[in-house]
C-alpha cells in the first residue's frame, strides 16, 4: 500500500512538472508570436521593449491568469454541485457577469470608471452562482441542474442581445464583440484586475482538504465534520469573483472550465491537492495556446478567443456527454 501511494505521489509530481514546462513554453511562444516574430535575443532591443514588454507581456499575463481562474472555477463548481458537467460558461455564470457589466454601462451612460464595471461584472456572476446553488440544494438530478444552468445562460444572453440591439451607444455595441472573448485591448492599465485574481487563485489552490470532502458528496462531507454552509458560500463567492474578474478582463470564454478538469481527472489527477494546481497550469497553457491561434489565424485581423475555445472545446464536450450517458 505504501509503495502504491509513493508511486501515485511521484506520478502526480511528474504531471505537475510536465504542466509547468508546458506553461513556460506557451508563455515564451506567446511573447515571441505576432505579426512580427521577436525572438528572446531581441527582447531588449528598442523594438522588443515596445512589442514585448509594453504590448505582449500584459496580454500574456492576463491570458495566463484568466485561463488558470476559469479552469479552477470549473473544478470548484464540479465539486460544489456534485456535477461533472458544471462549468462557469455552460451554467450561465459568465453570461451573468456580462449582464452585470452591460447593465452598468446602460445605467451609468458610459461614464462609470473601469473598476466600477469590473465590480458589476463580479456581482452579476455571483448572483447567477447563488441561484444555481439554490437549485443544487433542491437535490435536482444532474440533467435538470444542467438544464437549469443552460436556461439561465440563455436568459442572460437574451438580455445582453436586447440591450445591445436597442442601444445607440457605440461603446455598448463594441461590447458584443468583447463578449465573444478577446484580449486585444488588455494593457498595463488592467493590471489591477490581474492583481485581483492572484490572491483568490492562491487561496483556492490551498483548499484541497474541504474540496476533497465536498467531492465525496454532501452526506459524507457532513459526517467528516465539514461545515457545508460556510464552505459552499465561501467557494461560491470565490468562484463568482474569479469568473467576474475574468469576464471584466477578456469577456466570456467557454469550455476551459469544463474540459481541463475532465482531462486531468482522466489522467489520474483526482486528488484536489494535485488537481487544483494542475488545473491552474493546464488552464493557463490551454488559453495561451488558444490566444496564439487567435492572433495568428488571420493575417490582418484577430479571431475572438471565445470562438477558438468553443471550436476546440465543443467536440470534447460532446464526447464527455456521450461518455457520461453510457
From Swiss-Prot:
It is found in: Cell inner membrane. The keyword Transport applies. GO terms for molecular function: vitamin transmembrane transporter activity. SUPFAM superfamilies: ABC transporter involved in vitamin B12 uptake, BtuC. One of its GO terms (biological process) is cobalamin transport. It holds the Pfam family FecCD. It is a multi-pass membrane protein. InterPro entries: ABC_BtuC-like, ABC_transptr_BtuC, ABC_transptr_permease_BtuC. The chain crosses the membrane at residues 15-35, 61-81, 88-108, 112-132, 146-166, 184-204, 240-260, 274-294, 302-322. GO terms for cellular component: plasma membrane. Coiled coil: none annotated. The keyword Transmembrane applies. It comes from the Bacteria. Keywords: Cell inner membrane, Cell membrane, Membrane, Transmembrane, Transmembrane helix, Transport. The complex is composed of two ATP-binding proteins (BtuD), two transmembrane proteins (BtuC) and a solute-binding protein (BtuF). Belongs to the binding-protein-dependent transport system permease family. FecCD subfamily. This is Vitamin B12 import system permease protein BtuC. It comes from Escherichia coli O81 (strain ED1a).
Amino acid at each position: 500500500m505504501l509503495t502504491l501511494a509513493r508511486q501515485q505521489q511521484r506520478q502526480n509530481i511528474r504531471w505537475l512538472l510536465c504542466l509547468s514546462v508546458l506553461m513556460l513554453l506557451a508563455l515564451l511562444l506567446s511573447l515571441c508570436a505576432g505579426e512580427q516574430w521577436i525572438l528572446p535575443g531581441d527582447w531588449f532591443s528598442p523594438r522588443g521593449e515596445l512589442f514585448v514588454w509594453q504590448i505582449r507581456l500584459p496580454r500574456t499575463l492576463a491570458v495566463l491568469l484568466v485561463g488558470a481562474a476559469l479552469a479552477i472555477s470549473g473544478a470548484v463548481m464540479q465539486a460544489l454541485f456534485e456535477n461533472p458537467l458544471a462549468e462557469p460558461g455552460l451554467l450561465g455564470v459568465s453570461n451573468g457577469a456580462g449582464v452585470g457589466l452591460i447593465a452598468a454601462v446602460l445605467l451609468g451612460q458610459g461614464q462609470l470608471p473601469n473598476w466600477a464595471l469590473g465590480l458589476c461584472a463580479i456581482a452579476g456572476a455571483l448572483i447567477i452562482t447563488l441561484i444555481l446553488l439554490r437549485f443544487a440544494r433542491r437535490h435536482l438530478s444532474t440533467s435538470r441542474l444542467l438544464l437549469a444552468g443552460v436556461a439561465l445562460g440563455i436568459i442572460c444572453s437574451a438580455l445582453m442581445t436586447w440591450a445591445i440591439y436597442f442601444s445607440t451607444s457605440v461603446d455598448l455595441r463594441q461590447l458584443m464583440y468583447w463578449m465573444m472573448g478577446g484580449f486585444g485591448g488588455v494593457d498595463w492599465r488592467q493590471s489591477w484586475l490581474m492583481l485581483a485574481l492572484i490572491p483568490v487563485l492562491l487561496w483556492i489552490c490551498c483548499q484541497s482538504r474541504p474540496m476533497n470532502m465536498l467531492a465525496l458528496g454532501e452526506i459524507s462531507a457532513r459526517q467528516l465534520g465539514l461545515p457545508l454552509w460556510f464552505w459552499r458560500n465561501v467557494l461560491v463567492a470565490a468562484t463568482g469573483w474569479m469568473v467576474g474578474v475574468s469576464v471584466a478582463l477578456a469577456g466570456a470564454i467557454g469550455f476551459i472550465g469544463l474540459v481541463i478538469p475532465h482531462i486531468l481527472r482522466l489522467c489520474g489527477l483526482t486528488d484536489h491537492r494535485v488537481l487544483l494546481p494542475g488545473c491552474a497550469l493546464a488552464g493557463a497553457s490551454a488559453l495561451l495556446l488558444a490566444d496564439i491561434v487567435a492572433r495568428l489565424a488571420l493575417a490582418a485581423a484577430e479571431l475572438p478567443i471565445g470562438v477558438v475555445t468553443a471550436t476546440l472545446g465543443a467536440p470534447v464536450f460532446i464526447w464527455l456527454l456521450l461518455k457520461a450517458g453510457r
